[in-house]
Amino acid sequence: PWPGWLFYASTQVNSRNSIFRDIPVLNNYITRCQSILQEGKPYNDVLLYWPVFDLWMEGGQEELRFRVHHPDWIEKSTCGKVAHWMIDNGYTFDFISDNQLMDTRFDHESLVTEGNTVYQTLLIPSAKYMNHHTLQHIIHLAEQGATVLFLDNLPVDVPGWHDFKLRKGKMVASLEKLSFDENHTAQAGKGRIIIGKGLNRLFDLANIIQEPMLDEGLLFIRRKSQECVYYFIANQTSRNIDKWIALNTPGRSAVVMDPMTGWTGLINSREKDEQIEVYLQLEPGETRILRIYPEKTINGDYWPVLGTVSEVIPLTGTWQVDFVEGGPELPQGTIMDMLKCWTRLSDERALRFAGAARYTIDVDLPVMKQTVRWILDLGDVRESARITVNNQPVGVLVAHPFRIDVSDYIRNGENEITVEVTNLSANRIRDLDIQGVGWKKFYDANIVTQMYDPFDASSWDLKPSGLLGPVAIIPYPLKHFGAQ
């Protein structure tokens, strides 16, 4: 019987989960993202030293476990706070350990790791303890030409008690060779070692430039291949992005991809101060992948840029609602003049239903113009939606924003729009626990809460389900640029 034998993993990706019918869309999104994010090499500026000896020497009496539920060992450390600050301020970095640092060299004006990944500088975040071999190698990198940044202080001690005096003496001898001026900078061979209290000042001295898009609240991952630079960009703000965005990389042309749909096209770009700017439209919840070509001009079709909306066509009227798939029983179909959560229907079967309902409405549209893109906006959807227009499948939406281009499917006059909405299985699980059904029966690895307490969904609130709207069709004029 449903839901079958379930392991206590956080997500049940199997055919008994109602949302499983639309999981392929999510899988395709992940595939497209990973295909890019696993290509090439990291393209970050800073190597951030992980001062593990500070953690071990000052860790307290309890075990320091690497667990997702207890991240304080890094979140509350100086290194963790520095990492968060760098992310929030648009500075790119990768962590590096002592062993990895020992395999790092300076070559062609850059720090180069064992994997031949290139960085501009090394940052040591307030480390008190350091292996003397590591310190000696850091000084050697500076002597070869590297710029090394120490936040707040140089290390003052070596970890552990084995040969303590010998190792401490070697550390002191290495540090005494450094002579710092009034700007807390020491020349070391061809390079520099700089001590500073503020990260902004340190990065300015090392000529490390932040990504300007962080000023707009955009998050990003940057990669580099032999031919181009990749940006994965996410808008996790509540604001629409509709403007020129500067990137901290040179470029002659750029291509954009929506990893949710796979659509690609040239993106409008221009060069400014030896860097590239792109015209980016990104709604809250959306992601894009940019491919920047530093020296190559790419030809092709441009990604459509939507102009200013002059009217919105609300889809008001009568919605025919039919429950088409799921359980434990299909609720009775109904007619809605106003969209609402299906748990508010008078049919009690809807309270425990997990599955899909089909919403259908007829709408008359005005004469279409060639320069207009028609966007169907579903408003609030709980939780995924399959869209069909005039009996033609358009696409599946599984995340915000629940909007889709229907320009190629609608026609002048009357159109039939169908939206199949699938909810989560939570309400059905809730009902099983209310009834006391013994569905948790996996031997020795049963369903538990996040903190490994007995799992009980009987006190859960009903989860909103269905198409909540408001639903509208929006005709957007296209914005044209001189390069197109």
Predicted regions and their residues:
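Structural beta-strand segments of beta-rich domains
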Residues: 229, 359, 372-374
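Aromatic-lined ligand-binding clefts that engage carbohydrates, nucleic acids, or primary amines
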Residues: 246, 352, 363-390, 397, ...
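Exposed aromatic-hydrophobic patches
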Residues: 277-280, 403-409
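Short, well-structured beta-strand segments enriched in hydrophobic/aromatic residues
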Residues: 287-288, 374, 411-437
